[in-house]
Amino acid sequence: YTTLFRSVVRCIDESLALTYQNTLEEISRCTGKTYRAIHLIGGGAQSALLCQMTADACGIPVYAGPVEATVYGNLMMQLLALGEVKDLKEARDILKASVNVKVYEPHDTQQWREWAQRRKENGIKS
């Protein structure tokens, strides 16, 4: 890949991470709750760079995976409907035991807080 391509991808990932940070802040404000982790599922969970940037920007761990979350969710709902799984807790326990999830711990959060503050000062919300 070219340097330009890599720069564009990095710009997109940084923007997404800062948008996630802003969204997390808004959700926390609206609910009055503090969140201890983010679960990133689907295609974005395949990007180590995006996952690490999100952990750094939000200052909390990111649990990445499963990539095929829609398929797993659909399967669990069908198993619930058929009575093969007794409740949502059991479905979640089955998934936790069956799916590999990678954890990204936050680092260098101060730099990300400064970038987020600069975005707010410039009127950028997401």
PLM segments and residue spans:
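Acidic, glycine/GT-rich loop-and beta-edge segments that sit at the periphery of enzyme/chaperone cores
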Residues: 84-126
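Short, small-residue alpha-helix embedded
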Residues: 71-80
